[in-house]
Amino acid sequence: RFKKIRRLGALPGLTSKRPRSGSDLKNQLRSGKRSQYRIRLEEKQKLRFHYGLTERQLLKYVHIAGKAKGSTGQILLQLLEMRLDNILFRLGMASTIPGARQLVNHRHILVNGRIVDIPSYRCKPRDIITTNNKQRSKALIQNFIASSPRQEELPNHLTIDPFQYKGLVNQIIDSKWIGLKIN
C-alpha cells in the first residue's frame, strides 16, 4: 500500500496514511518528462487502487459508462461512487474501502432491510443502509464511527443517523463531491 501511495499520491479509500512530502520530491526529480501514456496509466491506476477494483471490473464499468448518455468520465465516477463499499466509506461506517468491503462480505450490512453481501452492489437513490441487528455488527460500526472523526463533511447525496447506525442515499452523486482528484 505504501509503495502505491508513494507512487500515485494520497488515496484516501486505500489507507488513511499520507505520503511524506520528501518522497514526492524525489519521485518528481527522478521521473523526467511525463508522457500522455504515463499520465493516463497513473490516473487509471489511481482509480483501480482507490476503489479496490481489478482490471476487468474497471473495464466493465468503462463499458457501461461508454454506453450511457453524457460524459463517460463523469458517469464512470458516478458508477464507482454509488458502490455499496464506497458509500459505507463515505458515511464513515468504515475507515477504508477495503474495511467497508469486509463489513459487506461478512454480512453486517442491510440495504432496504435485506442482507447484501456484495461490495459492488450499486446503490440507488432512496436506499436505506443499516447494520445487522446483531450486537457484534452494531459494535463494529459503533467503533468505526467513534474512532474516525469526520475530517471532511458528508457529501450532499448522503445522510447519516449515527445513533441508529443508518445511512440514506438521497440522490446520485454530484461531480464536485467526488473524493478522488482525477485528471
Curated annotation (Swiss-Prot):
GO-annotated molecular function: rRNA binding; structural constituent of ribosome
Principal localisation: plastid
Entries under SUPFAM superfamilies matching the protein: Alpha-L RNA-binding motif (SSF55174)
Keyword presence, Ribosomal protein: yes
Keywords from the UniProt entry: Chloroplast, Plastid, Ribonucleoprotein, Ribosomal protein, RNA-binding, rRNA-binding
Sequence ranges assigned to domain S4 RNA-binding in this UniProt record: 82-143
Gene Ontology annotations of biological process type: ribosomal small subunit biogenesis; translation
Protein function: One of the primary rRNA binding proteins, it binds directly to 16S rRNA where it nucleates assembly of the body of the 30S subunit.
Subunit annotation: Part of the 30S ribosomal subunit. Contacts protein S5. The interaction surface between S4 and S5 is involved in control of translational fidelity.
Family recorded in the similarity comment: Belongs to the universal ribosomal protein uS4 family.
HAMAP family referenced in this protein's UniProt entry, alphabetically: Ribosomal_uS4_B (MF_01306_B)
Name of the protein in its database record: Small ribosomal subunit protein uS4c
Name of the gene encoding the protein in the UniProt record: rps4
